[in-house]
UniProtKB/Swiss-Prot annotation:
Protein name stated in the entry: Glycogen synthase
CDD domains: GT5_Glycogen_synthase_DULL1-like
Gene name as annotated: glgA
Catalytic activity: [(1->4)-alpha-D-glucosyl](n) + ADP-alpha-D-glucose = [(1->4)-alpha-D-glucosyl](n+1) + ADP + H(+)
Gene3D superfamilies: Glycogen Phosphorylase B
Pathway it works in: Glycan biosynthesis; glycogen biosynthesis
Lineage of the organism: Bacteria, Bacillati, Bacillota, Clostridia, Eubacteriales
């Protein structure tokens, strides 16, 4: 008898290529493809946001929220297959009132929107004839669904054997709403207590997921440890310590087809680990594009949201010392006006050393990776970080603070397996010292060339991460179904 493939429904608020607000969408578009290429029967569920085409009609049904009936229409799309793999079906949960909008997040009725999505998701499984072994949820928007699965739907025979996994991509974002959201969703009022969903007088959707998920993971091993501390736990560290035996860390991968300097359509000159001449030409093109002198001065790239989390304040107070060095800095990003203003001032004071683009532009970001010698990630905290993994792929050496996924993926060049420059203390002078160590390394040309070739050959594909997720799924299934 042929063994049935593992069935996984991957649930996310955003998924590339359909809708994206942040890195979650990249994960949700890439990990299912890698799972499918490993033989998993994986499907994706998400809302049909306003910018998403209608897709093929599958079915519709009524969903009860707030003691009234709302219609959910299911439409289907697909994520293209990896080479040698299978394409991934995507189920769009369509309700114009809640999701026919321009943005994914940031509305006053977000509690109702994600509450409706949660119940509509669980009601969808039988109409589409797909009862998964694993419901893989992502971030706070899925919290109500996890609670509903455990508190209500577990009594339904078809749902009894489903195991739930919650991936926390960034614990800072939790989803806080008034107590009345429980009635809207249809969750019991007695769950409004400190050991369940109550959090400082509000309902916390992330906490709902952390309390009721069978297993939890974050997007790096170090971040899984960090969120159990008061410094990084955002008020949920006590709960996470209680659940430490159910908490795991799996580092994200990157889409090595998209991020490939040998084929990337956004960079002017292609190159590889075997021949990096194209990278030198890309650097000159980048310098010209940003109005910088074309020179061999080391070029530092920074492509981030300009917010506290990314460590941008570490530039404050080291500007004069930094730009006395023989270097150039190219910045692409937007965010806090304080940090946008900081880089505008630096551009004004050091016009031959600083290139700046306020905003986000994917082709331009790719050119920064393709032309930079170093890539800066001095993050205050970083659950995983994709920037350093992309930088490796393009031969830009990361200069990072040792936190979260940066600690898991970047090892200082002082060690035999080193692949970047790492500093520990969150202090401007430590950041400056790390940059200076990088500049010293850059001047050792033979060692520098060897390091570039080495980091470009590192394997940070999703296939490796997918193998770890399959092990996690097995553990979750055995927890719910001990007979397996």
């Amino acid at each position: 008898m042929t063994e049935q493939p593992l069935k996984v429904l991957f649930v996310s608020a955003e998924v590339v290529p359909f809708a994206k607000a942040g890195g979650l969408a990249d994960v949700a578009g890439s990990l299912p493809r890698a799972l499918a290429s490993s033989g998993v029967d994986v499907r994706v569920a998400m809302p049909r946001h306003g910018q998403i085409p209608r897709g093929a009609y599958v079915t519709d049904y009524m969903v009860e929220v707030d003691a009234r009936k709302e219609t959910a229409v299911i439409r289907e799309g697909r994520i293209e297959a990896l080479p040698g793999g299978k394409s991934v079906p995507v189920y769009f949960i369509d309700n114009y009132q809640y999701f026919g909008r321009e943005n994914i997040y940031g509305y006053s009725d977000d509690g109702e929107r994600w509450g409706f999505f949660s119940r509509a998701l669980l009601e969808m499984l039988e109409p589409i004839d797909f009862i998964p072994d694993i419901l893989h949820f992502n971030d706070w928007q899925c919290g109500p669904a996890i609670a509903l699965l455990k508190e209500e739907y577990r009594h339904h025979p078809a749902y009894r054997r489903i195991a739930s996994v919650l991936t926390v991509h960034n614990l800072e974002y939790q989803g806080h709403f008034g107590r009345d959201i429980l009635q809207f969703i249809g969750l019991r009022q007695d769950l409004f207590r400190p050991d369940a969903l109550e959090f400082y007088g509000q309902v916390n959707f992330m906490k709902a997921g952390l309390v009721f998920a069978d297993l939890i993971n974050t997007v790096s091993r170090t971040y899984a440890e960090e969120i159990q501390t008061s410094e990084y736990g955002w008020g949920l560290d006590g709960l996470l310590r209680l659940r430490h035996s159910d908490l795991f860390g799996i580092v994200n991968g990157i889409d090595v087809e998209v991020y490939d300097p040998a084929t990337d359509p956004h960079i002017p000159h292609h190159y590889s680990a075997d021949n990096i001449e194209g990278k030198k030409r890309n650097k000159a093109e980048l310098q010209r594009q940003f109005g910088l002198p074309v020179s061999e001065a080391p070029l530092l790239g920074l492509v981030h949201r300009l917010v506290d989390q990314k460590g941008i304040d570490l530039f404050e107070g080291i500007e004069e010392a930094l730009f006395r060095e023989d270097l150039q800095l190219v910045v692409v990003g937007q965010g806090d006006p304080r940090y946008e203003g900081l880089f505008r001032r630096l551009k004004q004071h050091f016009p031959e050393k600083v290139g700046l683009f306020i905003g986000f532009d994917t082709p331009l970001a790719q050119r920064v990776y393709g032309g930079s010698d170093f890539f800066l990630m001095p993050s205050r905290f970083e659950p995983c970080g994709l920037g350093q993994l992309i930088a490796f792929r393009y031969g830009a050496i990361p200069i990072v603070r040792s936190t979260g996924g940066l600690a898991d993926t970047v090892t200082d060049v002082r060690f035999p397996n080193g692949n970047g420059v790492v500093f520990e203390a969150y202090q401007p002078d430590r950041f400056l010292e790390a940059i200076r160590r990088g500049l010293h390394l850059y001047r050792q040309k033979d060692r520098w060339q060897q390091l570039i070739a080495k980091v470009m050959r590192l394997d940070h594909s999703w296939r490796r991460s997918a193998d770890e997720y399959m092990q996690l799924y097995g553990r979750a299934r055995r927890k719910v179904n001990p007979e397996l």
